[in-house]
Amino acid sequence: MSSIPWIDNEFAYRALAHLPKFTQVNNSSTFKLRFRCPVCGDSKTDQNKARGWYYGDNNEGNIHCYNCNYHAPIGIYLKEFEPDLYREYIFEIRKEKGKSRPIEKPKELPKQPEKKIIKSLPSCVRLDKLAEDHPIIKYVKARCIPKDKWKYLWFTTEWPKLVNSIAPGTYKKEISEPRLVIPIYNANGKAESFQGRALKKDAPQKYITIEAYPEATKIYGVERVKDGDVYVLEGPIDSLFIENGIAITGGQLDLEVVPFKDRRVWVLDNEPRHPDTIKRMTKLVDAGERVMFWDKSPWKSKDVNDMIRKEGATPEQIMEYMKNNIAQGLMAKMRLSKYAKI
């Protein structure tokens, strides 16, 4: 259903006004709202950061987070996060459209986006080709990333130049910026996206995902999946430690997009006190998905990588724990009620 700009803006304001750091930006002709992103929680260390934005224009209002890269029209956001407002929103759209019914033109089939692939990563070098004393090698060693996984990771000192080679015009100035580059392949082994992880602590965006075309895959690791359960984690680096591990990039949690429906097991970060994590776990449990719980874990770190590098866990120990702590349906609801601390 096509949207109506003034209705989009009204419901965006109503849906977002309660969020922390909400403000309306009045320095341009475009209707803009700024807020802390409810999808990723924005920054855990800086409560003043607000990287969620709503942009209203003459076509359709959209929400975008510059931290987790979540992007959706306001109608989709309402449907996912504000179902009561969504029903009212649909009613208002239908009521407004019912006032005048233009003569319907024959519907044209929507053009399918051209499925481009990323044939090369200019200005990058693969980690397994670098010398042991290179700074990025020291970085991945410090994170305990296995050496046999280095071939899946790349490094660049010219991130803006790399991005502009795939998405021209993204950066006006191609200044030097080092990032760990993580290519994202489709099931056929063709790269469609890549994620850049900031190496500077003060970088405004820790993770940035770049797509070759609008519908490009943002599911990491699918080209390496074998038989058996598939573990869906929150970050590409965590997935490198897990057999048959894949990862969600871009901050979205769309069950229709994630593959391996009959085999997947969701492994969210160990954050029983984080409202967004518990909200997403609840959504998965209510949808009948298989979910892995950290409630009996001997490790207290937030994610798999920290459990290994900070607490001395091995990938084998974590895999064994995960296999024995999967729940679904009523059992999952019971585990979640005990696990959640909010």
UniProtKB/Swiss-Prot annotation:
Synthesizes short RNA primers for the lagging strand DNA replication. The primase synthesizes short RNA primers on the lagging strand that the polymerase elongates using dNTPs. Recognizes two trinucleotide sequences 5'-GTT-3' and 5'-GCT-3' in vitro, but uses only the first as the priming site in vivo. Monomer. Hexamer. Interacts with the DnaB-like replicative helicase; this interaction forms the active primosome complex, which is composed of 6 helicase and 1 primase subunits and expresses full helicase and primase activities. Interacts (via C-terminus) with the single-stranded DNA-binding protein. Part of the replicase complex that includes the DNA polymerase, the polymerase clamp, the clamp loader complex, the single-stranded DNA binding protein, the primase, the DnaB-like replicative helicase and the helicase assembly factor. Keywords: DNA replication, Early protein, Metal-binding, Transferase, Viral DNA replication, Zinc. SUPFAM superfamilies: DNA primase core. The gene is 61. Belongs to the Tequatrovirus DNA primase family. Zn(2+) binds at residues 37, 40, 65, 68. One of its GO terms (biological process) is DNA replication. It is an enzyme of class 2 (transferase). It comes from the Viruses. Its EC number is 2.7.7.-. Coiled coil: none annotated. GO terms for molecular function: DNA-directed RNA polymerase activity; metal ion binding. This is DNA primase. Signal peptide: none annotated.
